[in-house]
Structure formats: C-alpha cells, structure tokens
C-alpha cells in the first residue's frame, strides 16, 4: 500500500514541477503520510480506509478550508502547502492532499496541546463554511456497508444521537495522535459542526479506555467545559470510531482484539 501511495504522491508533485528524489513514509495507517524529501511538503494519501475508493473529495476540500481558516486566524495547525495546489488530487486510485512539512514527529507536550485545542475552537467559532453535523451521516454510511449484527446496530443507535450544546466548527477527531510537537494540530478531514465537548470526547475516550495520562492532562489544560455534555458526547464519538475500526478489520486484523475490548467497555457503560 505505502509503495503505491509514495508513487502517487511523487507523480502528482512532479506534474507541478516539484521533484522528490528521496520520499519517506512517515506513517501508514488510516492515511499514508509521505515526506517528499528534500521538499518541505508532506503528502497525505488515502489508504482506502474506510473508503475503498479514497475519501470523498468534498471531505478533503472541507479539511483544507477549515485548516486554512484556522491557520489564517493564528491557530496552531499544520497549514496546507503553499508550494503547489494543495488538492485534492486523484492519482492511481488515491486521493492526495499536500501539507507543509513541520518536522519529524516527536512526543507532544499535552498541556500545550490542550491549550492549543481551545485556541483552535476560538478561531473556528465564526467559521461559516458548510460542515456536517457531527459524524452522523458518516456513521450511517459506514454501518450500511457492514454486515448486520447486534454490535453494528448498537453502534448505529449510539452514533446517531444528537447531543445538545452550542454548535460550531470542530476538528472532529481531536485525539493526541492528531497533534504534532509545537503543538500543531492536523488531520481536519473529519471536521464537523457540534458542541466543543464533542472534540473533547476524543481526549476523554483515550483516558477512559486506555488510562492515557497525556490525554487526561490535555483535557485538564483545555480548561472549562460542560462535564455533563462531554459525557453525552463521548458514546456518540466512540460509536463512530469503533464503527470505523470494523471497516478497517480486513486490512488491519490486529484491531480485532482491541475492538472486542472497546465494545465490551462501551456496552458496560452506555447500553
């Protein structure tokens, strides 16, 4: 998979007059991240998960728009590349977007990450671009593709709930793996509209199911939030995440035991 992604990224860059002689894969998971060395550009290339044909181009367009808006407001986000059209581009069955290279991944300082997430929310508070409401439509589309089962139905019922609170533009998947040192938040592909506590649910979920101290610290550093609304948002976010895990299982069978454990936890707390 990563070899195909690298070839696609290098080819599109070359079409724009930019040559990468030494590309290197930074990450191969939901997306393949390719540093197009020696260029200060990272290509994010669709891996086929959860969409075998790549994510809808509208999702990538929304991501670039939201990240660009936050960057112009001075928020701590990875900006799109300004050396070529950031995309989205299609090549060899992949969907590709180009971003500024900000250095090698290192451990993120959680206090700074939490504070930066609040600043992003402040920057996006007046964003008026079209965004989906939470991940409701995405969850329905994902569960429609899965073989019917009690687990799938359970996730669907949880995930279509609509928490209260004041809605605004959100990151959409604000766990610490989507924050680079700096800190710089990235991966706005699932940007959506909802209460800020929906973003905080990603940090709370990592704390709850993995006893992840950095996530707990980041949540504390974020500052004031509605704890009851966060508790309302958490299972809605978790249902979307675990439905995505189900789609990924054919390519990433190692997720199977993790998914089973997470579903038991979700049923024990929210069934």
Q: Which ranges hold each PLM region?
A:
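An alpha-helical support segment within catalytic cores of ATP-dependent transferases
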Residues: 4-10, 125-172, 269
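Conserved kinase catalytic-core helix
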Residues: 102-132
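Active-site acidic catalytic loop and adjacent metal/ATP-binding pocket
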Residues: 30-37, 41-44, 158-200
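ATP-binding glycine-rich phosphate-binding loop
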Residues: 16-37
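A conserved alpha-helical element in kinase catalytic cores
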Residues: 2, 6-9, 44-92, 108-120
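Active-site activation/catalytic loop segments of kinase-like enzymes and analogous catalytic loops
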Residues: 197-226, 236-253
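Conserved short submotifs of the Hanks-type protein kinase catalytic core
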Residues: 92-104
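ATP/Mg2+ or Mg2+-diphosphate-binding catalytic cores
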Residues: 47, 133-141, 145, 213, ...
């Amino acid at each position: 998979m990563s070899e195909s992604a690298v070839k696609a990224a290098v080819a599109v860059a070359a079409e724009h007059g930019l040559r990468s002689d030494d590309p290197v894969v930074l990450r191969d998971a939901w997306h393949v991240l390719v540093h197009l060395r020696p260029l200060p550009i990272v290509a994010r290339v669709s891996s086929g998960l959860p969409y075998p044909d790549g994510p809808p181009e509208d999702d990538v367009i929304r991501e670039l728009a939201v990240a660009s808006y936050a960057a112009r407001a001075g928020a701590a986000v990875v900006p799109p590349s300004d050396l070529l059209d950031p995309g989205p581009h299609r090549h060899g069955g992949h969907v590709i977007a180009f971003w500024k290279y900000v250095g090698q991944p290192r451990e993120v300082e959680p206090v700074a990450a939490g504070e930066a997430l609040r600043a992003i929310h402040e920057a996006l508070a007046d964003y008026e671009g079209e965004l989906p409401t939470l991940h409701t439509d995405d969850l329905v589309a994902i569960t429609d593709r899965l073989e019917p089962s009690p687990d799938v139905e359970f996730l669907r019922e949880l995930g279509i709930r609509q928490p209260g609170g004041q809605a605004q533009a959100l990151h959409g998947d604000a766990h610490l793996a989507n924050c680079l040192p700096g800190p710089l938040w990235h991966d706005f592909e699932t940007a959506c509209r909802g209460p800020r506590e929906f973003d905080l649910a990603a940090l709370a979920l990592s704390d709850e199911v993995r006893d992840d101290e950095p996530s707990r610290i980041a949540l504390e550093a974020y500052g004031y939030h509605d704890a009851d609304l966060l508790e309302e948002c958490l299972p809605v976010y978790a249902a979307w995440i675990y439905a995505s895990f189900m789609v990924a299982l054919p390519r990433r069978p190692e997720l199977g035991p993790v998914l089973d454990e997470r579903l038991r936890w979700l049923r024990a707390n929210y069934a």
